[in-house]
Amino acid sequence: MLNPALEHIETYKVEGGQEAEVKLNQNENPFDLPSWLKDKILDQFRHEPWNRYPDILPYRGMAAYASFLGVKPELVIMSNGSNEMLYTIFMACLGAGRKVLIPEPSFSLYDKLARLQQAGVVEVPMHDDLSFDVDAIIEAARREKVDFIVLSTPNNPTSKSLSHDEIERIVEAADAIVLVDEAYVEFSREQSALDLIDRYPNLIVLRTMSKALALAGMRIGFAIANPELLAEISKPKIPFASSRLAEITLMAVLENYSLVTDAVQYILAERGRIEAELTEIPGIHTFESDTNFLIIRVANASEVFRKLKNAGVLVRNVSGYPLMENCLRFNVGLREENDRLLELLKKL
């Protein structure tokens, strides 16, 4: 009676839970919004009618984000988190008999959504250093005649990025819709693919406000694409999905973007410091990061995960991903949280 694809899909779980003295397992921004800004947001929200539906789409929030990006409003659509936008795009691009190419490892939701749509999944392994194999992606897309390509860059869980030129090579070569998921772009050394949208009608760029903008609890995401493509991929989208509170919050944060800039600078400085200290710890291999999180390889990831959790520090065991045996992932936290983690790792 149910979708047969459910037999091959597991319920999403966060190993170790979501509570800890030092929580570094979900790639979150360690800085919450300041109280004065929350008060401003709530004061505005109090004057909104709570008994009325919000707009079908949050047009004011979309216009504000388009202005922030420097693009036309008709290129932008807002969603209830980037995950909701992923559901929408996958529904629009895939179905039985169609194929999607996913570099592996990548964000686990991609594979889940593809299988729910009963689409074929073409996996292209990363290099051993977890970097993208661009030539293999292009070759597989042609050979398999895929309809859709999903590129998480910077990538979760590997923390590696495609260069701007590499993205353009793939988009230009592909006879397919290409989704570039830029959830972590604010932390990257590489240039965004946004400027390619005017030249490539098959390109979609995905953004989230959950990471750099510290709005994970508000659920705000965006897709940016040419108007014709955006109109088509928006057809399956759930109406009224974005709350007025989320829209007001987004606009307030964009008006005070120096808070984001300061947080990103802090995180990048801490990332560099953590990487430098990790390289001095015997038995730990550190992969260079282009995100707000780091990947390390240890002798026994399950044992290290357990010891850290017992000491009050929650990280993510990503050993189940291809090429990531005995790897752990943790986001950059506050300096004192990072020091706690480093101290424990040095004692292992």
From Swiss-Prot:
<dbReference type="InterPro" id="IPR004839">
    <property type="entry name" value="Aminotransferase_I/II_large"/>
</dbReference>
<dbReference type="InterPro" id="IPR015424">
    <property type="entry name" value="PyrdxlP-dep_Trfase"/>
</dbReference>
<keyword id="KW-0032">Aminotransferase</keyword>
<dbReference type="InterPro" id="IPR050106">
    <property type="entry name" value="HistidinolP_aminotransfase"/>
</dbReference>
<feature type="modified residue" description="N6-(pyridoxal phosphate)lysine">
    <location>
        <position position="211"/>
    </location>
</feature>
<dbReference type="GO" id="GO:0004400">
    <property type="term" value="F:histidinol-phosphate transaminase activity"/>
</dbReference>
<dbReference type="GO" id="GO:0000105">
    <property type="term" value="P:L-histidine biosynthetic process"/>
</dbReference>
<keyword id="KW-0663">Pyridoxal phosphate</keyword>
<dbReference type="InterPro" id="IPR015422">
    <property type="entry name" value="PyrdxlP-dep_Trfase_small"/>
</dbReference>
<dbReference type="Pfam" id="PF00155">
    <property type="entry name" value="Aminotran_1_2"/>
</dbReference>
<dbReference type="InterPro" id="IPR005861">
    <property type="entry name" value="HisP_aminotrans"/>
</dbReference>
<keyword id="KW-0368">Histidine biosynthesis</keyword>
<comment type="pathway">
    <text>Amino-acid biosynthesis; L-histidine biosynthesis; L-histidine from 5-phospho-alpha-D-ribose 1-diphosphate: step 7/9.</text>
</comment>
<dbReference type="InterPro" id="IPR015421">
    <property type="entry name" value="PyrdxlP-dep_Trfase_major"/>
</dbReference>
<dbReference type="InterPro" id="IPR001917">
    <property type="entry name" value="Aminotrans_II_pyridoxalP_BS"/>
</dbReference>
<protein>
    <recommendedName>
        <fullName>Histidinol-phosphate aminotransferase</fullName>
        <ecNumber>2.6.1.9</ecNumber>
    </recommendedName>
</protein>
<dbReference type="GO" id="GO:0030170">
    <property type="term" value="F:pyridoxal phosphate binding"/>
</dbReference>
<keyword id="KW-0028">Amino-acid biosynthesis</keyword>
<comment type="similarity">
    <text>Belongs to the class-II pyridoxal-phosphate-dependent aminotransferase family. Histidinol-phosphate aminotransferase subfamily.</text>
</comment>
<keyword id="KW-0808">Transferase</keyword>
<comment type="subunit">
    <text>Homodimer.</text>
</comment>
